[in-house]
Amino acid sequence: DIGNNEFVAIIGGSGAGKTTVMNAMSGFDYDISGKVYCNGIDLRKNFQSLKNIIGFVPQQDIIYENLKLRRMLEYTAQLKMPPDTTKGERDERIQKVLQMVGLEERANEYIRKLSGGQKKRASIAVELLADPGLFFLDEPTSGLDPDTEKSLMNTLAKLSKTENKTIIMVTHTVQNINLCDKVIFMGPGGKICYCGKPDKMYEYFGKDSLVDVYSELASNVDMWNMKYLMLYKEQHLDKNTEIPEVNENEKISDMIKDSGKKTSPLKQLGVLTKRYFELVFNDRQRLLLLLLQPFIIALLLKVVAKKDVFKIYDSTQSIMFALACSGIWIGLFNTIQEVCKERPILKREYMGNLRLWTYILSKYIVQAVVCFMQTTILTGLFLVLMKHAPKKEQVLPTPQLEIWLTIFLTIYASAALGLIVSSCVRNSDRAMALAPFVLIIQLLFSGVLFELKGAADKISYITVSRWSMECLGNITNLNKLNMKVTGMPHEHNDLYNRGASHLTNTWLILFLMMAVCGVISVIVLRNLK
């Protein structure tokens, strides 16, 4: 049993199940037996109603390093606090939270410039915005030096008493465990061996040091687990202690007040989009790289392009294929790490009131701007450098604009594909490891290197490269161009049939692919755990 405003530490060796127990207690892990009660309310049964009064800080930081601390808290406050909260009230809450964690003087610094301990305090500040009564922290002192660890422990102990928070944390370090009100010691196999005051722990085990306690539990965990269960039975079960019956609906209503109200979808989308814009444009080095890529690629395409591009079949098909592949790589590189690198933050916000479709749509909106700039640089410079140009437009005022739109849709659809990959994996390394595989599929089923027949033709329907090349072949009228060797005919390719309706329909297919990729990304992310 954990009382109100208690500061509790769950300790034990690696693999003892500390985090598993905390996840079960917090209600974030449904795959458990038994029940957890919060003020007499079944937490698992009423988790959707109670989750807004629960703060949870995972081991990874849940903050964006490319935002200033105050800006990070402002965005989070707009997402977490009741929708009718005024800006003045949000600012007041942010200032109070900064004071709670001792970061007032760091409020206007970029989070990436904060120390490890300060970043952990910033993560705690993010959760404090919603004023939760129950707080869970997973390894908050991991990787901190002794002085920083002591400072953080003092902050947590102060929060539990002065701010009326019940704080439960998992930790390996015990130098300042005396600041806790209660310690839960877990032995191998997830067996609880002690639950009580920290100053009584060594006396309970009959040992003088933590190392001796670990050694004792490694060899006699069942005995100590049995002792704990017997004591628990004597203190609680033999006294017929029961969970008091409460009117859950009334109790929940009293506990959550206005915290359960959700921000409107449009407002949430606006906040997420504005935040993502700021993140992208604050990362100047990466943004420069994203815009430098199409510039360099356009120059390289000019270097390898022959003078008879748009005049001769071989040269035109090759350079259009290179242009399409360049667009695919640029789009994929834009987003393949965008979701997985934010996974801890996304998971925590989704446990709150974040709508996944607004999250993905905010990515689409910002990426549309980035893709627009990249397309303009790539196609604009490439077409200016070319000696010749396609001769006749079909849908737009000029064939150059038709090529621009095709490459824009190619880059954008590839960025949407990158979001799927990023949604499926847990870290950036795995995402980048999958990038070559995705690109190889685009190369094989583009219809340029190999003839598409049977299964290959069907697979090509889900590739960006096939539809991109179909558009470019249509615009440049490949079927009507001559081979380099005079008099040598080339086989007519139905993919490159010229026609305004054919071109428009192919553009629509690329647009539809973007929409489908967005839906798939949302579905994949619904399995966040």
Describe the residue ranges of each PLM region.
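Topological signature of polytopic alpha-helical transporters
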Residues: D1-E6, G13-S14, S33-C38, K80, ...
